[in-house]
């Protein structure tokens, strides 16, 4: 095949994909990247951060991006990497937890909520972790009292806690403030999965924050050891650009393996070959948008979220919880059936595991007319 025929054939395949801007994707935490990402991607498409000595400029960019993310998360000494996404970030954190626990002769018992992302199930299988699942409160957050009591009863058996800041299904935030105190008091590690919430919570206007809800989640809390934060979600970076940040660079000692044939003799990330596109795009987009740009982006998404909730209630639908961020769960006892019927009309939503509900993520690509069209279709679907 010649080049033109190849491109023509590839366009046929690409035409079968949904496009974010069409407004039918309502269940994804990813969105259309910022337009500048296309130019940056072309500039950095051949870079490989797996061998940083060959790509010194891109490697410097990664350190700058980690520093920028650390600034958002209140840590000027953060250490970490831009990697493939939240799954790799969470696996990396759990790998560090396991190795630190082994060095202290502790069992690898980790408290992880039912609302945690399925990447922690992968970590459990891969690393033979023992997982404790605490009960959830009515707000779908971990029961802190249960955790405190459990650790007091079995102090030497718990090596770490995972808290969620913007859970995949509902957007709920565990009480990281209290979990941090527990971690400090008991000298155990605390990882915060803010893959989604990391680019939402710092920019959220007070008017959208629920009364009585604690939104603290980052390194301003002494007990937080590590945080997952994904630029390719609400950060508008192209896929794949996930982030793992640790409190300081001492954690590197528990991640490094020898890599004698590379330009740097040790490597800490799970994936060896890493494109520099995610790093460079994240750097450029963060520099372009700045704090004010992300505040505007988040608050526009929250305005649309509130519109969705208001209109849904007018149709007679109820939310499982009041939205904590731009994720909405609409109660539905026949969630799987409804989801499939909506898919026949090209609407792609998802379902919650921990509650009978449809899950909608109000990402920047969604417009008011998309939301209104979806709710009309949902209402018609439920009539039959």
Swiss-Prot record:
Pfam families: Pyridoxal_deC. Disulfide bonds: none annotated. Coiled coil: none annotated. It is an enzyme of class 4 (lyase). Its cofactor is pyridoxal 5'-phosphate. Belongs to the group II decarboxylase family. MfnA subfamily. This is Probable L-tyrosine/L-aspartate decarboxylase. It comes from Methanococcus maripaludis (strain C7 / ATCC BAA-1331).
């Amino acid at each position: 095949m010649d080049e033109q025929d190849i491109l023509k054939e590839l366009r046929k395949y690409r035409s079968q994909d949904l496009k974010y801007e069409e407004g039918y994707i309502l269940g994804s935490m990813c969105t259309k990247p910022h337009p500048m990402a296309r130019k940056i991607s072309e500039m950095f498409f051949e870079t490989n951060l797996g061998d940083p000595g060959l790509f010194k400029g891109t490697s410097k960019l990664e350190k700058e991006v980690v520093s920028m993310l650390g600034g958002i998360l209140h840590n000027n000494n953060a250490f970490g990497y831009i990697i493939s996404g939240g799954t790799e970030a969470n696996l990396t954190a759990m790998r560090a937890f396991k190795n630190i626990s082994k060095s202290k002769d502790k069992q690898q018992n980790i408290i992880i909520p039912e609302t945690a992302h399925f990447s922690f199930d992968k970590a459990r299988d891969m690393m033979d972790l023992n997982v404790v699942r605490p009960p959830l409160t009515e707000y779908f957050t971990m029961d802190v009292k249960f955790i405190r009591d459990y650790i007091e009863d079995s102090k030497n058996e718990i090596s770490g806690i995972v808290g969620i800041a913007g859970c995949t299904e509902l957007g709920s935030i565990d009480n990281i403030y209290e979990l941090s105190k527990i971690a400090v008091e008991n000298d155990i590690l605390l990882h915060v999965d803010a893959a989604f919430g990391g680019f939402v919570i710092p920019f959220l206007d007070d008017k959208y924050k629920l009364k009585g809800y604690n939104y603290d989640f980052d390194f301003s809390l002494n007990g937080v050891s590590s945080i997952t934060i994904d630029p390719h979600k609400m950060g508008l970076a192209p896929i794949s650009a996930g982030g793992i940040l640790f409190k300081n660079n001492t954690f590197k000692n528990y991640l490094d393996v020898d890599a004698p044939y590379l330009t740097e003799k040790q490597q800490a990330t799970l994936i060896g070959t890493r494109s520099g596109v995610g790093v460079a795009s994240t750097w450029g987009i963060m520099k372009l948008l700045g704090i004010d740009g992300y505040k505007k982006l988040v608050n526009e998404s929250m305005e649309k979220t509130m519109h969705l909730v208001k209109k849904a209630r007018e149709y007679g639908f109820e939310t499982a919880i009041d939205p904590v961020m731009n994720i909405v769960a609409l109660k539905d006892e026949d969630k799987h059936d409804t989801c499939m019927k909506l898919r026949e009309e090209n609407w792609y939503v998802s379902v919650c595991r921990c509650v009978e509900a449809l899950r909608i993520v109000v990402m920047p690509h969604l417009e008011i007319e998309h939301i209104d069209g979806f709710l009309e279709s949902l209402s018609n679907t439920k009539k039959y």
